[in-house]
């Protein structure tokens, strides 16, 4: 896959799924180039300026990125960093753990309540979501289809805080039914037109063939939609 197109698609995932439909987020996309794909690269693919009072679907977007990078045989796992530099609280999305993590200040662990004072950060990688959910859900419910980590922002003048939550669908049977229907479709071979990209990206994506290779992407997309329809409940 063309590197520029990959950067566009990863940024589209953030734009489409980080918040609920209709919520506009401030995303700054980096200029693509070989430097962003090197191990330990210090430039984020995109930076999101976080806003007060919103819920961010952080685990869903992370897992979507991880799948996308795996599908193009990228050898490293993504790394997301939430930080407060005193001027703004941002989410930076990297293709791998940057070598200059100290630049983001004192690192705090993901927890139910995180007070993100000036020059502190939360670094999220592959295992952090499972570790956070371990004490909150049964082991059979740790995957993203049965539970997801989200965070809510409290960003006011004298308080910069994040509340990490685990949400589950109210009707797991309905979720399983929808996912089963999609899985059955995977055995068929037809052309599927993906949703149009946002006008800001101005990227024209050609129709692609539905197969077992890309069924995971479709299922993840449906999970996001199902989460909205079924109104995920907090644990």
Swiss-Prot record:
Phosphorylated. It comes from Saimiriine herpesvirus 2 (strain 11) (SaHV-2). InterPro entries: Herpesvirus_viron_egress-type (IPR007626). It is found in: Host nucleus inner membrane. It is a single-pass membrane protein. Belongs to the herpesviridae NEC2 protein family. This is Nuclear egress protein 2. Forms a heterohexameric complex with NEC1. GO terms for cellular component: host cell nuclear inner membrane; membrane.
């Amino acid at each position: 896959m063309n590197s520029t197109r990959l950067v566009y698609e990863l940024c589209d995932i953030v734009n489409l799924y980080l918040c609920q439909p209709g919520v506009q987020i401030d995303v700054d996309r980096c200029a693509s180039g070989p430097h962003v794909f090197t191990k330990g690269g210090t430039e984020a693919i995109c930076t999101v300026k976080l806003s007060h009072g919103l819920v961010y679907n952080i685990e869903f977007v992370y897992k979507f990125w991880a799948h996308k990078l795996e599908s193009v045989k990228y050898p490293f796992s993504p790394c997301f960093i939430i930080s407060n530099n005193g001027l703004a609280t941002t989410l930076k999305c990297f293709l791998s753990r940057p070598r200059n993590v100290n630049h983001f200040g004192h690192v705090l662990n993901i927890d139910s309540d995180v007070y993100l004072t000036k020059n502190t950060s939360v670094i999220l990688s592959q295992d952090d979501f499972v570790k956070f959910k371990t004490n909150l859900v049964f082991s059979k419910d740790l995957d993203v289809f049965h539970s997801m980590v989200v965070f809510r922002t409290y960003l006011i003048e004298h308080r910069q805080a994040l509340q990490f939550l685990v949400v589950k669908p109210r009707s797991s049977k309905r979720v399983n039914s929808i996912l089963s229907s999609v899985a059955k479709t995977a055995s068929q071979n037809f052309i599927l037109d993906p949703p149009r990209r946002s006008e800001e990206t101005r990227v024209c994506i050609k129709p692609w063939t539905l197969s077992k290779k890309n069924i995971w992407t479709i299922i993840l997309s449906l999970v996001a939609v199902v989460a909205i329809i079924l109104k995920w409940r907090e644990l």
